A protein has these predicted regions:
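Conserved N-terminal subdomain of the carbohydrate kinase-like
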Residues: 48-133, 312-316
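Conserved phosphate-binding/catalytic region of the ribokinase-like
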Residues: 1-5, 150, 205-316
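Structural alpha-helical scaffold elements that stabilize or flank donor/cofactor-binding regions
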Residues: 121-122, 182-183, 214
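Active-site metal-binding loops of divalent metal-dependent hydrolases
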Residues: 10, 134, 163, 257
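Glycine-rich phosphate/adenosyl-contacting loop at the front of the ribokinase-like
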Residues: 1-74
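Conserved beta-alpha-beta core of the PfkB/ribokinase-like small-molecule kinase fold
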Residues: 128, 136-211, 228-229
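Glycine-rich phosphate/pyrophosphate-binding beta-alpha loops
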Residues: 87, 133-137, 292, 298-301
Length: 316
């Protein structure tokens, strides 16, 4: 049995590490993509996962497949395409470790996944179907994602969504908002950042969580607040978790690691989302906030996921 299957982008994050003797940046190639980071966190904390997506038949595609396999993620749902190159992201940082992105994705292999290439048996086997909005930027992967979500809902799967705003990948803000809002309407569990809440509704995290619960039919809203922790809310309970003090060097993948860690704890509880108590939300949120915070002390997405013992120790 698979706990979680995710559909979405796989890419290489090129992160500036230093400068050479001429002043040009040197960059590290880190395997990433939000759904892959999300699944890798789940695997790190004892869950079984599978990926649906596409990479190019190139060195970076091979690196991504090898990385996911090493993380224990089932990769039989990943297609390899000879005609397009694996997507690349270039990440730069400010003094606090926050990121700015540019992409080589015109097109990237992840955008070329077709519905007929999606391994539906992996959805059948899973308890949870997870997706983000970067697989809604372009065809044919947009249609593949929409049909996969509909299929998963028909099969009675728990639907998890991370809207994951990356404006450079959209033609304009309105297109991004349209697809993000569609995604949120599909989901039972949502992980969203305070910045994304502000982008969509220009409101506070608390107001955003309430919107998700009352207007979108979401059962569990999780709003990440950067260094201020997170807010978790259901219709009957809420909890706000703090983060441990860390010295961030790279926030790449921290939100994904939060989401995967939270989902791992939710699955450990083995109860309906509608039945979650405040203590349950503390069990989920405190662990996820700590795991995400610790990940920022290391570079990259998947390589930065902290071990379970390190998270529990930091929680005290």
């Amino acid at each position: 049995m698979i706990d979680v299957v995710a559909l979405g982008e796989l890419l290489i994050d090129f992160a500036a590490k230093s400068t050479d003797s001429t002043g040009y940046p040197t960059m590290a190639a880190n395997p990433g993509g939000a759904p892959g980071n999300f699944l890798a966190a789940l695997n790190a904390y004892g869950r079984k996962t599978a990926f649906l997506g596409k990479v190019g038949n190139d060195a970076f595609g091979n690196l991504l497949l090898g990385t996911l396999n090493a993380a224990g993620i089932e990769t039989r749902g990943i297609r390899v395409d000879d005609s397009v190159f694996t997507t690349l992201a270039f990440v730069t940082f400010d003094e606090s470790g926050d990121r700015a992105f540019s992409f080589a994705r015109k097109p990237g292999a992840d955008t070329q996944l077709r519905w007929d290439e999606v391994d539906k048996s992996l959805i059948d086997e899973a308890k949870v179907f997870h997706f983000g909005t970067l697989s809604l930027t372009d065809e044919p992967v947009r249609t593949a994602t929409q049909k996969a979500v509909a299929y998963a809902k028909m099969q009675g799967k728990l639907i998890s969504c991370d809207p994951n705003l990356r404006l450079p990948l959209w033609p304009d803000e309105d297109a991004a908002k349209e697809q993000m809002l569609w995604s949120l309407h599909q989901a039972d569990v949502v992980k969203i950042s305070d910045n994304e809440v502000e982008f969509l509704w220009n409101c506070t995290p608390e107001e955003g969580a309430d919107k998700l619960l009352t207007e979108f039919g979401v059962s569990l809203a999780m709003v990440t607040l950067g260094p201020d922790g997170c807010l978790l809310k259901t219709k009957t309970a809420s909890f706000r978790a703090a983060c441990p003090k860390v010295h961030p060097v790279d926030t790449t993948g921290a939100g994904d690691i939060f989401g995967g860690s939270a989902m791992a704890r939710l699955l450990e509880l083995d109860k309906s989302v509608s039945e979650l108590t405040e203590d349950d939300l503390k069990f989920i949120g405190s662990f996820a906030a700590t795991a995400a915070s610790l990940s920022t002390e290391h570079s990259g997405g998947i390589p930065s996921i902290p071990e379970m013992d390190a998270v529990l120790k930091a929680m005290g």
